[in-house]
């Protein structure tokens, strides 16, 4: 009963904002100036807008317009220049030298140079609470060789480094602004991207305005970008149809057929690099030992065997995902074929529960309030019940769920990870002891050893062997029960051109314009 009131409230507020926007646009047209605003609907409200501290997928969507990176990826996952124009490795693969783009400034007018890169990498590594520390662990020092040349020194070869620098660890913020506001930088971030931060209203909007001195300004065609979090996929779609949004991410799979039949809109689809899974508290806090799911791997195996992944994909995702049981899709060349997706087996699940001495185990599944998360949780709940599990669904606002996961205040957590171009980005931070995204609290020295070897090994065949070993060992403990790898589903006004679907699911604003 609460949800319909919420939906009407959101529509009403969007309608009021739309009316104001029309009035402003009319005024500008009279003055002979046509303002171009791009309005993007997000499935969640991002967490803190500081690349060092952030950890949400929707935050990365905002950062794509706000904070340039040293390098980026393209549609085929090739590493391409952004703030760095070229790079070269030393023969022993322990030094990376990067040449930087000249003439770049931050949004406060400060110069981007090698000293700024050194500051940012060190900030990522050393700032209290940094979520980038583990990503850059092998980088031991950074040297500014000259104004536009920077050297990253590593303790050992680090195969994922370029992929790491193509994401938040490679995002550059203004050293001056970060030093002036060390604790609340995320409330007013200063970067070097095509748009600068102007306003944020929690759960309502993030407003960015075009940065006049952007190095690639000829490729930017909007004066303003407004990100609006709209948790309910139905409302998100309604706002696209009414013209209050120009682009929406994570369209409900069930809405795709009707969108395809509407000539006003375009649909884009691409398989993600990440996964949807259920993270289980196996050691994050004392709460892990209070529930048989957390303390006994046999109960976790029984839970997994109660699930039909293909059924989940069909019922909850309308087929818009690939069933999976690892941090990578079965289509990925690094997928461990020695650990295939298990079939549902209710009889075996019940036998394991009996062996563990557990009758009708009960646990709470914390689930973000997103539409797809709720659908999947309900299907999981129904399937697990057939094996004797009593799953309680706890719907929690996304940023709040992350904070609770940090504290270990959960039994199981429905969490999607958007994925990275290198497998390490889906793996190390989730299973390395004391890593910031290790919400399960899983920690084993032999796993850490294999993780570190996979990072220092550059030969793909040898890395694949290490990933095979990791998959086999982690599968026995099941700190994460992987479910599937979804398709990113976008819908947007057909007048919007230049949209480039890339497997990381992020929207690049460069080249976007209304035709």
Residue spans of the language-model regions?
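Sec/Tat signal peptide C-region and signal peptidase I cleavage site
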Residues: 30-35
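N-terminal lobe/hinge region of extracytoplasmic solute-binding protein
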Residues: 41-91, 122, 190-191
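Extracytoplasmic/periplasmic ligand-capture domains
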Residues: 75, 101-131, 141-143, 189, ...
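Long beta-strand-rich cores associated with HINT superfamily self-processing modules
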Residues: 490-515
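Hydrophobic helical h-region of N-terminal Sec-dependent signal peptides
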Residues: 20-28
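Active-site-proximal polar cores
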Residues: 483
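N-terminal secretory signal peptides that target proteins for export/translocation
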Residues: 1-14
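Surface-exposed binding/hinge segments that line
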Residues: 1-3, 99, 133-176
